Amino acid sequence: MITFADLAEPAPGAERCVDRQLWLACAGGMCTVPPVGAAVYYFPQGHAEHALGLAAPELSAARVPALVPCRVASVRYMADPDTDEVFARIRLVPLRAAEDGDVEEDGAAAGEEHEKPASFAKTLTQSDANNGGGFSVPRYCAETIFPRLDYAADPPVQTVVAKDVHGVAWNFRHIYRGTPRRHLLTTGWSTFVNQKKLVAGDSIVFLRGDGGDLHVGIRRAKRGFCGGGGGAEEASLPGWDQYGGLMRGNASPCAAAKGRGKVRAEDLVEAARLANGGQPFEVVYYPRASTPEFCVRAAAVRAAMRVQWCPGMRFKMAFETEDSSRISWFMGTVASVQVADPIRWPQSPWRLLQVTWDEPDLLQNVKRVSPWLVELVSSMPAINLSSFSPPRKKPRILAYPEFPFEGQLLNPAFPPNPLAHGHHHYHHNHPSFFPFPDVSAPAGIQGARHAQFGPSLSDLHLTHLQSSLMYPGLRRPDHVGPTSIPPPRISTDLTMGSSPPARALSMGAKKPDDAKPPGLMLFGQRILTERQMSLSGTTSPAATGNSSLNWNTEKGASEGSGSGVIQNSPTDNTSSERLQWFRENSTVSELGLEPGQCKVFIESDTVGRNLDLSSLASFEQLYGRLSEMFCIDSAELRSRVLYRGATGEVRHAGDEPFSEFIKLARRLTILTDAGSDNLGS
């Protein structure tokens, strides 16, 4: 049996290790390295990005899994002998299927938290880096990091001895002089600058160890851009490291190549091969290389992937300046949830979130982030409540024993605990890692939750939902056998009285002939939908329910064969499907709309905005108002606005006189693609 002690033994003649505290100070305040014994996930995709993507084709050809659960066997903190750039050699032991449960136990890592020692970093100015000049020491550093200076002497002066990352001692003359008086390093500083080849923009780090010893380290500045391809996008943020210590990514390949030149493609392929085969392996990590950590604490990954990420979620993320002098939080919004590289890594959560920022100018090149690097602020997409009608009392829905409620939107296709389901078996048996939780909830609760926000989630067209809201890998679970009849569904949205049973009866389940049509009750009085009221004008009250039921049943029969609610077929943005979606969703409740008002929807949106048509006099004014509301050129709107006519067919705005249009239109839909102009038959 291989033990951690055996794995941790360094080979004879191994490179000299750096003091851990000094290493962390040089790496940056937000850099984290998992301690020995910690459970981590190793991401080969992130490792390839760390190596400038040199071995990505070889990894994809070898069918390396998206992530491998491991335990840290040893960590060696080291520094480049020429540049002083710090890096770590991390030895990992993959966990087998029988040990997958151990990934939850991270107790060994919790005990290795150390108090950070006093340290200070300063970016060198042109004066500091001049040959023959001195170093201006900030007062905080001189009084808290350096040994105490005897201010009674004239002038106050002392010799400061500091050891670098290689253990070499450097002597500096520390003096307090000038007008105004300031702390300076004079004699010995020029030698240090010349030997270390420091330039303006580099940072110097002073640290006082636990024993009182003084240490000095270096953080090299990134040297511009070199163009050419690489594994990451080029950064153009002056002063800001694109991913800080938390997520140093999307920086210039040329700038990062200085520290990552030793991450060879063959080493990357070998590490991935050993990891896939369940053998111990070693990786080299450069914390200043402007890419995220690819050995991530398992607890952080699992916690992040339990969140049901969807567009519109608000989050915050920490960034630090390139010299690691300060850390700031930036707010952002999830724009989409999709795999970053579906060809090579189709099941990888690495950089799963495509994001937009509240301050896009500062973070213009940070387009994708991994879920475990952000902190969720709001799980509900931002909704403009001003466009909704005033809250109304929620009528209760009649209970029908033959229609059991189903308030569940959709279930994930991935197990809640992939490790417990044999996540890592080697030999390429690696299911996707998306442990979203079960989101089932009582129908009454979900109905109340969504009553004042328009259509309930259970009434939305699921193929539309999969393509626009959820991660593409999610699908409706196939609980129904080939010959069994699934349980029918009924809408849990208490504000929708005109939902056709075509969506309520899933997979063509038939409703008994003697069943009463669904209705709404408010204070003991039945509430009729507009369609039921229109039918009651020409038929007797006793026949009203049957007429409505027959109409809905016929409509359900015509749509049953193409029900996209349960089908797992991929969603196509064709004209016919868009028209079908418009027809299925055009029966939005008109309760609360005054005469001359309507709801306006962007195609595939489930939340509309109110528009007073009575205040408009022509289609030109209509297009102008819509252009202001949605920031779309009015000329493009002429062929993109659809509405439902009196006879139920979908028409273009402008097919009827504007006076008739005002009377009939209760829902407008703006197509996002001009090519979907085909209304079909």
From Swiss-Prot:
SMART domains: B3
Molecular function, one GO term: DNA binding
Pfam families linked: ARF_AD, B3
GO biological process: auxin-activated signaling pathway; regulation of DNA-templated transcription
DNA-binding region: 120-222
Domain PB1: 595-675
PANTHER family, alphabetized: AUXIN RESPONSE FACTOR 4-RELATED (PTHR31384), AUXIN RESPONSE FACTOR 8 (PTHR31384:SF37)
UniProt free text on domains: Interactions between auxin response factors (ARFs) and Aux/IAA proteins occur through their C-terminal dimerization domains III and IV.
Role this protein plays: Auxin response factors (ARFs) are transcriptional factors that bind specifically to the DNA sequence 5'-TGTCTC-3' found in the auxin-responsive promoter elements (AuxREs).
Oligomeric and partner information: Homodimers and heterodimers.
Official protein name in the record: Auxin response factor 8
